[in-house]
Amino acid sequence: MAIQSSSSGSKPPAPKRLVAPEATAAEGDGGRDEGLRPRRLADYIGQSELKQVLGIAVEATRLRNDALDHVLLYGPPGLGKTTMALVLAEELGVSCRIASAPALERPRDIVGLLMNLQPRELLFIDEIHRLNRVAEELLYPAMEDFRLDLTVGAGPAARTRSLELPPFTLVGATTKAGSLSSPLRDRFGLIQRLEFYSCSDLEAIVSRSAQLLQLELAAEAAAEIARRCRGTPRIANRLLRRVRDFASVRGIAAVGAPVVVEALAMHRVDGRGLDPSDRRLLSLLETSYGGGPAGLDTLAAALGEDPDTLEAVVEPFLLQLGFLQRTPRGRVLTDAGRAHLEAA
């Protein structure tokens, strides 16, 4: 069972878009999605290569009766990094303490976490690329030698006091592996990327979640949700909940594909998972700039969006679908993107 960190750091605001991959406050650790998480590797759908690598590491750790090597999980948001950390803890029969790097502002925050670890426990740090320098440097000897080096005093009278820590496993999660410093990255024994999920895996995830939610969902309905969730289980479960709400209010006991289409059309999510923000960008490129190229700042100003938000939140999925291209001269609408607009 996960043990929540007691830090007072504020949570990020909930995303306004239904198809945003970031977790809302209600979906976070201990939130609504907690009951939908798989508990064991055998229950974890998708990420077959990752499961194989971690399965071997877990079994070897059991045979040695030792702590699992430190693990770095990276990839886009919503793909199951937190879930995998909790699964690893369950497989090893230990607790998992959860913290977010932005909340570890002061040295005593990370010191408190490390000092309270039990032998072979997991410490999960989300957004680990956002650790400040002091917290990161405290982790170096802790990860390498299970030792905590504390500086006592200041100036010429300062001295270092070393405290032994029990063997533990740090599981770091990040969407920006390239932002980690080399000394921190090199201390992870296992570095694994989570990939976007296939449509068949997402259908299985949606069907499993529907059973847990006690929702009668037809196979073709699960497929409709899977096609719209951008390869991301978190979005799949969010869309499923909106379909469940719709069916409940309309008094629909058995949910088929037409119900899913109607329910998600109310939220303006189309058959490829695009929402109004996505379509506005594609439409602007076509109608105002002849398909492009158009600069990011120009597009952001025309849409009333922040350029960083446009680049980090709206564009990635359009690039993944091949509806948009980034060129040295600016953004360009592809033939596939134009065809999608015409079909809408």
Curated annotation (Swiss-Prot):
- Region (Disordered) spans which residues? 1-37
The annotated region (Large ATPase domain (RuvB-L)) lies at: 13-197
> Which terms in the Gene Ontology molecular function aspect does this entry carry?
ATP binding; ATP hydrolysis activity; four-way junction DNA binding; four-way junction helicase activity
Identification of the protein by name: Holliday junction branch migration complex subunit RuvB
> Any idea which positions bind Mg(2+)?
T82
Q: Which residues bind ATP?
A: L36, R37, G78, K81, T82, T83, E144, D145, F146, R187, Y197, R234
Per the UniProt entry, the signal peptide is none
Give binding positions for DNA: R326, R331
- What is the organism field in this record? Synechococcus sp. (strain RCC307)
